[in-house]
């Protein structure tokens, strides 16, 4: 009886240690990514702060233009952020939003759609369309403050991506 109990004890101990190691590895990888993003923010803080409003405006304009088609050119988000003149981008956004302000619910919704479009850009077209439909439904279920918070977080992460 003692041998099986001892064997069971060692099996459980081994499994426990293995689970702890796997948990530590997962935490380490996540912490490493977070540390890298923090380093990027600190190293490029000024650039990051300047890039955030550009990314936000680009996201809003991108989705607004898809829906309202004020500019006949189908711009890529990457081009809006990195190559389009910032004054022109702001003018295009104002034209697209019309009577809606940049702080409006409409603008925030466009911003979220633009941000998620970029996050899902790597997916095949059909899958991307399906996911964007889910995003639209999720946006409708969020409160105004939750949408603003989500948009801010998304734009911050996008800006980090452009710094990499």
What do the predicted segments below correspond to?
Residues 20-164:
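Mitochondrial intermembrane space
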Residues 1-4:
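Positively charged n-region of N-terminal signal peptides that target proteins for export
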